[in-house]
From Swiss-Prot:
This is Indole-3-glycerol phosphate synthase. GO terms for biological process: L-tryptophan biosynthetic process. The gene is trpC. It is an enzyme of class 4 (lyase). It comes from the Bacteria. The lineage of its organism: Bacteria, Pseudomonadati, Pseudomonadota, Alphaproteobacteria, Hyphomicrobiales. SUPFAM superfamilies: Ribulose-phoshate binding barrel (SSF51366). CDD domains: IGPS. Signal peptide: none annotated.
Amino acid sequence: MTDILRKIEAYKREEIAAAKSRVSLDELRARIADQSSPRGFHAALAARRQKSEFGLIAEIKKASPSKGLIRPDFDPPALAKAYAAGGAACLSVLTDTPSFQGAPEFLTAARAACSLPALRKDFMFDTYQVFEARAWGADCILLIMASLTDDDAHRLEDAAGALGMDVLVEVHDAEEMERALRLSSPLIGINNRNLRTFEVDLAVSERLAPMVPADRLLVGESGIFTHADCRRLEKTGITTFLVGESLMRKDDVEAATRALLTGSASAVAAE
């Protein structure tokens, strides 16, 4: 685990302990009972692949540790609607506050504004967070293999499955990919960003994609700015992409989303 991830785990553990003291697991279960059923995150992406279309997980992200504030006029419901109108298949919503200025209410509001399934984008360490995610309306959670033991990953995956949620398993190198493939989730995300240096290189996806059997659905993450980037990764078998920052910086998010997916109008420019 990198120093960055260790620091994140430390504050997340504190957050989790505080949350448990405020809201019991029984209360979360009650809130989950009042939620509508999960929308089918993997199913939405698989449907795009079935039709030989690019599948986009469009990210709602206000800020990041490496870039600071990304979008000052931050309106999650409006962004969700723009993404949906532009052709996105799913949403990813940051709920981590210290590093990304995210919040649970951003997830709830974005999902309520459209019909797309939503991922809780956060650092998951405890099954309590899985219950939180479903109580807030999430249809999918993220597991970052660099921050988890195999036992933790299995435990979190099982908790999500029991709640009818999907799991996106994120990797950055071959060792993490081998571990991810021992999980049952069909969704494997390859993060092209090095969490030690924050450098981004699409060659990471090109190296790791051949390791993945055809029954898994690969997601390219980070460093995807243009339709040409999507076409480049398509050659490796990756036709699903998680994109946030480059779209978040655009005035017309709907048009930028459409351009990224189809190549029409002006492609999304690298920031």
